[in-house]
Curated annotation (Swiss-Prot):
GO cellular component: cytosolic small ribosomal subunit
The protein's assembly and partners: Part of the 30S ribosomal subunit.
GO-annotated biological processes: translation
Domain of life according to the entry: Bacteria
Record-given protein name: Small ribosomal subunit protein uS17
Organism lineage: Bacteria, Bacillati, Cyanobacteriota, Cyanophyceae, Synechococcales
Region Disordered, annotated ranges: 78-103
Keywords: Ribonucleoprotein, Ribosomal protein, RNA-binding, rRNA-binding
Pfam families: Ribosomal_S17 (PF00366)
Record gene name: rpsQ
Ribonucleoprotein in keyword set: yes
Keyword RNA-binding set for record: yes
Species of origin: Parasynechococcus marenigrum (strain WH8102)
Length: 103
């Protein structure tokens, strides 16, 4: 039996070692033949907590890890530019912010 793989976008990373990945599938409508998009959300295991919202990832089917989690992150295809900015954000010091307000 072949290993199932999906490519999707991380839409939530608020859980420990778990992310929610949205996978979009496109198919023609059986009657009208218009291309229809359907989004399925999978909970996937992220051992290192390395994924952030907006990342493109490849997930593979694994053994059941919990009630809803049966997928694992195989690789991160691309990181979200928004996640890169937040990781290296340089927020102004509180003194500098107070100085700007007083001026």
């Amino acid at each position: 039996m072949a290993v199932k793989e999906r490519v999707g976008t991380v839409v939530s990373d608020k859980m420990e070692k778990t992310v929610v990945v949205a996978v979009e599938s496109r198919f023609p409508h059986p009657i009208y033949q218009k291309t229809v998009s359907r989004t399925t959300r999978y909970k996937a295991h992220d051992e290192d907590n390395s994924c952030r919202v907006g990342d493109r990832v490849r997930i593979t089917e694994t053994r059941p890890m919990s009630r809803h989690k049966r997928w694992a992150i195989a690789e991160v295809l691309s990181h979200s530019p928004k996640a890169d900015k937040s990781a290296g954000s340089t927020a102004p010091a509180p003194e500098a912010a107070a100085k700007e307000v007083s001026e």
